[in-house]
Structures are given as C-alpha cells and as structure tokens.
Amino acid sequence: TLPMNGLTARRSLDLLDLSAGQIVAVTGAAGAYGGYIIQIAKADGLTVIADASEADEALIKSLGADIVVRRGEDVATRIREHFPDGVDGIADGAVLKELVIPALCDGGSFASVRGYEGDGQRDINFTKTFVREYDGETEKLDSLRQLVEDGAITLRVADIFKPEDAPAAHRRLEAGGT
C-alpha cells in the first residue's frame, strides 16, 4: 500500500505544488490514497480539510486532518463554510470532479487520479496523477519510508487473513471500504 497509494498521494501533492501554510481539501479521505494525502500534506506543512462519513470522522482526525466535513454531493458547500475564499488545492480521491470544484479558489490546483481535466474554468490548474511518472525515482519512495520511520505516516492494515480464507479476503476487498 505504501509504494502504490503513498507514491500516488506524493505525486498528487507534488502536482498541486502547494507551499506550507496553504490549504488542501481531500475527498475520499478514509481511503488509502486519501489517508496518505492527509498525512503527507501535514508533513509538508499544509492545512488539511477532509471529507468523511460520521463513522470515519475519528479516523480522519487521527490521521491529522485539521477540519473534517461530512462527505456527499454538497461537500464543496461545507468546505466553503470553513474557507469562504476557497481552498488552494484539491486531491479528489472520491472522484467527485465537478461536484467539488466550487470549493477551489480561482487559480487553484486540482489533482485527479482518474484523469479529469475540467473545462478550464476560473484559471484552475487541472492535473492527472499517474504514479508511473515516479518510476525509477527511488528518492520519492525513500522519503515516504523516512516519514513512516519518523511516525508521520501510519500504515493501516484492515485485517489479516489466513491463506485458506483468501476467498473471504477477496469478497471483502470487492465490497469496498478497505
């Protein structure tokens, strides 16, 4: 999970090109990618506002989010309640696309893991995150390893299965939420 999801999160944050003190919003925050975005963003000195269900709110806070808002189609409105001028960047792990763009300030940056390019509105910088672009850049993975060793990133394990329980593990993975 660290090489794939952690590097994908690192790539997204690098594409957003935010500086310490700026604000990033994270959708799909309870997922592996979203969780890494939160933790790496905090290590980078960013302010993090993240979405979550009521059941996941404590998890998202424990990962370091400064503000947690309820997820859903009107998440952009809830983000703007905290940041009326909009956030500087969005890491869209929930693939909300045009539903979350209103939370972004004019000239902000949007990172998509599914290649969403927007329509060029409000001078927004739309980026596509492809982890393969970090192929061979071992220093990126090494920096994540260091964050783990420093305690800035926690590795989450949903459950442990015995080999004979592999079918149950696959069913759980296919059901989502792991």
Task: Write out the residue ranges for each language-model feature.
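Terminal helix/beta-alpha structural elements that buttress the NAD(P)+-binding lobe
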Residues: 1-178
